[in-house]
Amino acid sequence: FIILVGPSGCGKSTTLRMIAGLEDISKGELYIGDTLANDVAPKDRDIAMVFQNYALYPHMTVYDNMAFGLKLRKFSKEEIKRRVEEAARILGIEQYLDRKPKALSGGQRQRVALGRAIVRNPKVFLLDEPLSNLDAKLRAQMRTEISKIYQRLGTTFIYVTHDQTEAMTMGTRIVVMKDGFIQQVDTPQHLYDMPCNMFVAGFIGSPQMNFINAVLSKNGGKYTLDFDKYHVPVPESKVNADLDNYVGKEVVLGIRPEHVHDEPEEIAKAECLLKANVDVTELMGAEIYLYVNINGTPITARVEPASTAKPGDDIEIAFDLSKLHIFDKDTEKTITN
């Protein structure tokens, strides 16, 4: 289950359209299975595509919408009936087969669009932001539905989205794109834990990673990241041969909000405490987002709901040093393990 993710205009939908044969491939080779597909007509590529808009025929029933492609390919009535009913059962829309699209909700229409693709039994499913027209609750439900379909069918899915939640929860591998270039291809967890550059680090994760300009210092064989009046130790697990090239230079310290703590037990054992002023708090139910600043440097922390911090409070925070990242300030590439 491949996810193409990135901001608007990064080239993810264009890539999908090239796979589908709707755009010319300017360079490189496209293989579908073992077949070189650059010059294969779209109708012969054995792919099925689901778009952001459902593209259902309003005058046809759900059954006829799902069966339409099979009828064009001259399948027998018995085979069409078998495939449509099986897809409807997988998607839980058996009771809607006699209805017209206007009698369905947005989520049901999206299921019909998926069903129309499933009956084709293609080698590859291409999905171009299929959930963006749905409300938040339906999106979450359909994410689960599509993941179940993938597990059941075992077919290749290539899914385009700008929503990193969809990317992280659905994909087995994620392709992060920016300005037409692939930034990183990885599993969701590895992408989250070990981003290759600041763009990936900031794009994956919500709230996004904190970035702090700092100077790398070395004293007695120990490295620290210095900013304001603070000297944040670099743990041994993050040290590599490249670090010496950056001593005395400006770098960027990266730390995710969930690795910034204000809990007393974390403060008590912290190697480095930082004093911060609370600007805003957001109660999310199971957690609180603290928006604080360290002498003007903004930091976001995702803390336990037991936190008593209020806007205007001066508090102490600590970083989970084992989770910090260091980036080259010029190239924005990661320089830590």
Spans of model-derived segments:
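Conserved coupling/switch loops of ABC nucleotide-binding domains, chiefly the family-specific signature
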Residues: 26-29, 79, 179, 324
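Glycine/charge-rich catalytic "coupling/switch" loops of P-loop NTPases
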Residues: 222-278, 298, 308-337
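ABC ATPase nucleotide-binding domains
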Residues: 40-199, 203
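Conserved ABC transporter NBD signature motif
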Residues: 28-36
